[in-house]
Amino acid sequence: MPGTLTVIWWRDIPAQVIAKDKRRASKVVLHPRFQVAIDKAASRAGKRAYNDYIGEWRRTQRRCGDDIDEEVAAEAERLEGDYDKHRLAMLIQSGGVDGGPVFAPAHDETQGKALDA
């Protein structure tokens, strides 16, 4: 029986891939550089309060095949390839919005973690 594949995003930055069918679920949390990018983008966008930050999460869903483990792995690999360091850096600068305006760096962002692969 086909399943449902879900990608969880903070604005336009992916964070997790989940697939479910009637009996099972499979999940991959993307590389830590995605969470670092989300945190930095949120800071740039002024989304420091929990309620501001949490309200920006969204899900996209599509049908997937029977092998949900393979579907999750393939989608995670695709996202990690599509969202390289350069693309994540651009999303950080725009506060997490693809093609959005560039925000000035937040003071605390310059002291954060590096965006390493």
Model-identified regions with their sequence ranges:
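Residue-level marker of positions within ordered structural domains that often coincide
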Residues: 17, 39, 84
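Acidic, aromatic-enriched beta-alpha/helix-loop junctions
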Residues: 22-60
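Charge-rich, low-complexity amphipathic helices
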Residues: 27, 52, 56-64, 94-105, ...
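C-terminal charged interaction modules
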Residues: 73-117
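Helix-rich interaction surfaces within compact, conserved domain-sized segments
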Residues: 46-90
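Short, charged/polar N-terminal "headpieces" of proteins
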Residues: 1-25
